[in-house]
Amino acid sequence: MPLLSQMQEYQADTTFAQLEALRQKLREYEYHYHVLDNPLVPDAEYDRLMNELKNLEWQHPEWITVDSPTQRVGAKPLDGFAQVTHEIPMLSLDNAFSDEELDGFLRRMESYITEDPHTLAFCCEPKLDGLAVSILYVDGVLSQAATRGDGSTGEDITSNIRTIRNIPLKLNMDNPPARLEVRGEVFMPQKGFEELNERALEKGEKTFANPRNAAAGSLRQLDPKITRQRPLVLNAYGIGVYESDDELPATHFERLQWLKSIGIPVNNEIRLATGREQLLAFYANIQAKRPTLGYDIDGTVLKVNDIGLQEQLGFISRSPRWAIAYKFPSQEEMTVLNDVEFQVGRTGAITPVAKLEPVFVAGVTVSNATLHNGDEIERLGIVIGDTVIIRRAGDVIPQIVGVVMDRRPENAKKIEFPTACPVCESAVVRVEGEAVARCTGGLFCGAQRKEALKHFVSRKAMDIDGVGEKLIEQLMERELVHTPADLFKLDHTTLMRLERMGEKSAQNALNSIEKAKNTTLARFLFALGIRDVGEATAQNLANHFHNLAAIRTATFEQLQAVQDVGEVVANRIVRFWQEPHNVAVVEDLISQGVHWQDVIQVEIADNPLKGKNVVLTGTLTQLTRDQAKALLQSFGCKVSGSVSSKTDYLIAGEKAGSKLAKAQELGVKILTEQEFIALTGEN
């Protein structure tokens, strides 16, 4: 909303006490965000309250005080670190949330410079979501590092900054400045964040909510050894103090390139843009790239490129006039939890789903969010009626990441986890050691039957592409299909009676069903939906036993001899075949013509691929990714999605990227597609 329109919404009778209460609320949020690294509300809510305070102070300038949040940058530092006074204040940026507010930023510059802002060159950068730092080099050697803190005083984090691998301890130049202060953002890439949380879970430790919290918590450890273990990265965005006989370049963009030339890392997405349309194009381009960047950003930063013009434009109390952060629509918002419903999955898992007051988050309206399980409800301390924080990043399913406790209503209601299935009323049980509660109804439960059918026809199972979720729902609602075998009994007349089913659609579905009869033993096993038997385990079972009869009669001990089959999975396979209903469905499927060739035992004792950990990357030209994976699994290989010290081989197709670089770094054996095919003996 334009600033003027917002101002008109406020009543003239606002009291000083109300304004002070708003300031105190903002101070509390700032303290939790900057000092405790534990945000209480989404950034969007903080920004809204800050705008409200700015507007109230605009209406009542006589009420502005030097300690107002509008006059400061961050929060006071903790006493656990030595304090560092910034010679040049580390200011924050004003924000724009719409094209109209960007226009206002350009228009305001007209009062301070003679040039037309719409023809100026801007240095455009992604707005990294990390922690702002200052790093001082004396005679080219890293001497001191500090957090931004409140803009005037930060915390001395020199020992921790020294542990970050992409920050040089010595500048890459012959005649370094006497003093050079590099300013930048320390952040944690998404992959490193995920691996950090995985390790924490394995150790039973607390996980971080997001990469920013992880970066902040890691950078402000009192023990640098802990920081050294964290995957932190610096991207420089500017220069503070500079003392040298040599002059710096005259533009911001050139200064960043100079920093890069002396070993200081800068972001690869920085571009120059001239005029409004190019600024908007940069914003749109970075927003489109956001899901694939590999690190969190929450907008763009647009800076007048000419340093002389920056100096002419100057500063206001807490930010420069020559730069603005044009932020993306928030990925976090607040809304109210109206109710919780419980869904039943293919394996009987009971999943609580939050029913929310609809809220616009990251470009879409969200009214539902997963709550995962009872443990998550307990961890969040959430009750019906709470104001909650919703996060939606990229294509990730919206989730509740926090509760705003000071907004809990008096009539809030505890969430009661069901003891009976909401679909079939069978008992709900939770096995000791598992987080998930499950319906015990099995295929008696309509919800489990529906999800089992969806799994059966899926691409990696029987691959019946003419039968989708909506068709399965119709078939079940009309009680035309009860088990997977019933799909193979459908005829043209039956399908034509269904809604939105034309002649061509019906025939396509029947053709897909007929085609699916010819499958593989591994696909068939996976399609049966035996709990914890995924693609790889199904392939291992097929390779080990060679035929279905051997699998059906395998003992617990024989199953445990299969690669990656432990006690739990072996038990589940045995129990599956002990259930008469399951055996009847399998026999019915075979009687309907579902068939496959038994797996031929191939002697692979001398093949170097046997039993190895393998990763695929890049574009393969002679095989599809699925074909290559199946071929590897036939040699008993474990196919992984990421490179680690445990990886034996990396098969690199065309345009291989970061996985190839990591494999080279770790000394992993690298095969081309041709070398891989030669090893397998495939033509």
UniProtKB/Swiss-Prot annotation:
Residues 604-683 form the BRCT domain. It is an enzyme of class 6 (ligase). NAD(+) binds at D43, A44, E45, Y46, D47, S92, L93, E125, R148, E185, K303, K327. Its EC number is 6.5.1.2. Zn(2+) binds at C421, C424, C439, C445. Its cofactor is Mg(2+); Mn(2+). The active site is at K127. SMART domains: BRCT, HhH1, LIGANc. It holds the Pfam family DNA_ligase_aden. One of its GO terms (molecular function) is DNA binding. One of its GO terms (cellular component) is cytosol. The keyword Zinc applies. It catalyses: NAD(+) + (deoxyribonucleotide)n-3'-hydroxyl + 5'-phospho-(deoxyribonucleotide)m = (deoxyribonucleotide)n+m + AMP + beta-nicotinamide D-nucleotide. CDD domains: BRCT_DNA_ligase_like (cd17748), LIGANc (cd00114). The keyword Manganese applies. Keywords: DNA damage, DNA repair, DNA replication, Ligase, Magnesium, Manganese, Metal-binding, NAD, Zinc. One of its GO terms (biological process) is DNA replication. Belongs to the NAD-dependent DNA ligase family. LigA subfamily. PANTHER family: CHROMOSOME TRANSMISSION FIDELITY FACTOR 18, DNA LIGASE. DNA ligase that catalyzes the formation of phosphodiester linkages between 5'-phosphoryl and 3'-hydroxyl groups in double-stranded DNA using NAD as a coenzyme and as the energy source for the reaction. It is essential for DNA replication and repair of damaged DNA. This is DNA ligase. It comes from Actinobacillus pleuropneumoniae serotype 5b (strain L20).
